[in-house]
Amino acid sequence: RAEDAGGTGGVLPLTRAASAVSARMFALAGRLRGGRPLHPRGLVFDATLHLHGASRPWGVPFLDDTAELRGMARLSRAAGLPPPLPDVLGLALRWEQPADEAGVAELLLASTGQGLLGRHLLRPRMRWVPAFYGSLLPYAVDGRRLFLGAVARPTRTVPADDAALARAADERPI
């Protein structure tokens, strides 16, 4: 899902300052934790990305075209809190680009809200599915900004713990 954020896509001084503070905090957390500061554990699955195309052209095949891409998905809990405590959930996607765009692409998403304000806020959840996973910050595309997201369709409920996720994936695609 792509959503226009408006604006020119320029980097604001506040954004640069927030990025610098975040980088220092994550480096410190990683040293204190002795490993990854966020998403320390997760499960990796084969994945199929179903791209539906945007409602208006962006000039980028990934956004404009209807396609089915094969790749990998990693689902993880951000803080690594034990279930059943809610945690911010992460969805990391990796896929091979089509032949004319050689290389590997990655998209990192987290459980967020969907509204005008909510898309900027992390949302701790207790279930992998149903859920919305979005980009916290917009991507710059041809002078415009947009938010990307993925919807875990509500065909069933899957609690946010690794064992339940593994069982659900063994039964059928998530």
State each model region's role:
Residues 1-174:
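Active-site-adjacent core segments of small-molecule enzymes
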